[in-house]
Amino acid sequence: MIKTDALIIGAGPTGLFCAHQLGLIGLNCEIVDNLDKIGGQCIELYPDKPIYDIPAVPECTGEELTNNLIKQIKPFNIKFHLNERVEEVNKVNNKWIVKTNKKKEFVTPNIIIAGGVGSFEPRKFSPKECEKYENRSLFYSIKDKTIFQDKTISIFGGGDSALDWAIELSKSSYVNLIHRRDEFTGAQLSIDKIKELEKSGKLKIYTKYQLNSVKGEQNIKSIEIKHDDESLKELETNYVLGFFGLIMKLGPIVDWGLNLDKKTIPVNTENFETNLNGIFAIGDICTYPGKLKLILSGFHEGALAARGCFKYARPDEKLRFEFTTTSKAAQERLGVKK
């Protein structure tokens, strides 16, 4: 049985920064995530994709952001339990008893849900034969863009992910961009850019087409795409990428007694507590009036949720607000040497 001041469910940027905020105020925590690596969607979906809206960081990748957050929480010696999912949550004597699918048991006054409670699954191609090529020459997310260098890539989708990767991969590969509709739904700047790239011969756009079949032995050699008018076209290609969005499955969380709004958890905006005392929700999983699904917003939510945990972890103490620039206690916890 593992005792901790707070258990964070989700090892993405929001959960990592919340762990930092807990450490600053003297609370310990452990982190559980059903993914096999730290970083959440940042690492799983766009480790190499640039992020432009982190304060004071003009540009960084999901991997760089994750690595910096890990470095930031290093002084607190936080233990991670990866590739593990929370299955049961029960309250006994003002403590939450949390059990995972690997039979671990945590006792804590606080649970912070920062994602990691369910799973994100990509919407997939319809043709059944696509399954045999998955993670070899057909992908729904990109973890290492270098494998596509000097290859022909066929990208399916019309949203931001498809457009962004078409632009990025066209720098070192030839790209076919295929969309089932006549118009793209991504940012206008990206739409303008792909049209420029087509004019320069860097990529080819096919609209009103969908994947009809895939050909190849171990790896894909060519694909057949079908137009709305039923005409067929065959394209030679080395890799196929599909960006049709994600389906989120909440998993066991639906049985925990939380109020749910579709696939999100309503919270207050004072400390992002749910309808259950001692359970907080931050990041994309939570909802409230004016909610923005930004990493920046998740950092704010994590900071306030951490302070909300203090009253349950230290009921006989009063939390004083202090700046890290002047707080000796915070600096000692961070290992600052003077």
Curated annotation (Swiss-Prot):
GO MF annotation list: ferredoxin-NADP+ reductase activity; flavin adenine dinucleotide binding; NADP binding
Reactions this protein catalyses: 2 reduced [2Fe-2S]-[ferredoxin] + NADP(+) + H(+) = 2 oxidized [2Fe-2S]-[ferredoxin] + NADPH
Enzyme Commission (EC) number: 1.18.1.2
Residues that bind FAD: T14, D33, Q41, Y46, V86, F120, D284, T325
UniProt keyword annotation of Magnesium present: no
Cofactor(s) annotated in UniProt: FAD
Protein keywords: FAD, Flavoprotein, NADP, Oxidoreductase
Cofactor note: Binds 1 FAD per subunit.
Subunit structure: Homodimer.
UniProt similarity note: Belongs to the ferredoxin--NADP reductase type 2 family.
Protein name: Ferredoxin--NADP reductase
Organism: Pelagibacter ubique (strain HTCC1062)
Lineage: Bacteria, Pseudomonadati, Pseudomonadota, Alphaproteobacteria, Candidatus Pelagibacterales
